[in-house]
Amino acid sequence: MWSSSSSLCRNPSFRRAWLSTVTVTQTAAPTSSRLAALRTQLATEEASIDDFSSTNAPTTTTHYTSSNGSPIVRQKAAPRSAKILPKPRWLKAAPATSDNYRKLRDTVRELGLATVCEEARCPNIGECWGGGEDQTATATIMIMGDTCTRGCRFCSVKTSRAPPPLDPHEPEKVATAIAQWGLDYVVLTSVDRDDLPDQGADHFRQVVTQLKLKKPSLLVEALTPDFQGNMDLVHAVATSGLDVYAHNMETVEALTPKVRDRRATYRQSLEVLRYVKTIQSDPIGTTNNHNNNNGCLTKTSLMLGLGETDDQVLTTLRDLRDADVDVVTFGQYLQPTKKHLPVQEYVTPEKFDFWQETAMGMGFAYVASGPLVRSSYKAGELFLQKYIAQKKQRNAEVAAA
């Protein structure tokens, strides 16, 4: 019964077009009539190339009936559920080309250091590693392994309930390598280690202490986990001799359960930062500490573009000032993989400027805000601005006494 149209039906392109756009029930009508009706229906359909693409086809199951009465089922591909926003032009970073950048890059590989700068493909690596006359060269080193016990929905670091054990020689090896690197400022960060009795606090402390012993002039920032809110562990790291204690809030309170691991709560992170300021009057760590007995600066970072509102950001800033946090940075959230939270908004540079002005007006000592800003962005530069101002103030007070 298909003899008069067999060559047409054997054509693959025709069969695909027919099955994706038409529901046909075979009857006993003459072949010429069926073919004429089919041509008429095809002519009235406004099919485009998207109708033949599996990524754009509708999510429907269409049932057909063959000439012998047997059912034919065609499952069309599902569309992508979340619309992917195109990246705006302001998220393009200039390539890193300076001599100092290349020197530090080669040294990192020679010494076998693991830097967040490279592993996270940070867009600011050229600025931070490049240094210059008006800023120090800065890098962020990850310690305690590359596997985290938590699974935050914005982060692409590997996760496991039982990561490999800590390397007991890491504090000495990392301190020796960094001391040889020629940096002025280093940021130490780590994965969460909820599998350890002290969550790695003593290990963190040892790395800082060894660094200060080997290179007293080196400025050290510790970007720490929340240590499950155990303030004894926070105290151990805060009094290790570091210059800046950083712990990231990441986002506003309303979005925290969605964005971060369930064990990382907004209030717990806020209390970690608050507690560090309460021990400012304690002697901090070693005699090589640059802040003497004045304590260390506290710092946190917020990602924008996750769906937060202006009122929520303002509330977070008020909470941070109430906790006496010194430094805050704002940066654009970027989805690391399709499995992670999608970007809800690409915040404009003008809006980042607004948040910088707003935060400075609220009394923060320093604010870095921009689409490509990350928590350790130009860390050495922002610390030195604060440190030099404090030093001048102390000198003026001594002279006036």
Swiss-Prot record:
Region ranges (Disordered): 49-79
PROSITE patterns linked to this entry: RADICAL_SAM
Known catalytic reactions: [[Fe-S] cluster scaffold protein carrying a second [4Fe-4S](2+) cluster] + N(6)-octanoyl-L-lysyl-[protein] + 2 oxidized [2Fe-2S]-[ferredoxin] + 2 S-adenosyl-L-methionine + 4 H(+) = [[Fe-S] cluster scaffold protein] + N(6)-[(R)-dihydrolipoyl]-L-lysyl-[protein] + 4 Fe(3+) + 2 hydrogen sulfide + 2 5'-deoxyadenosine + 2 L-methionine + 2 reduced [2Fe-2S]-[ferredoxin]
EC number: 2.8.1.8
Residue numbers binding [4Fe-4S] cluster 1: 117, 122, 128, 376
Keywords, comma-separated and alphabetical: 4Fe-4S, Iron, Iron-sulfur, Metal-binding, Mitochondrion, S-adenosyl-L-methionine, Transferase, Transit peptide
Keyword hit for Membrane: no
Pfam family, any one: Radical_SAM
Protein name: Lipoyl synthase 1, mitochondrial
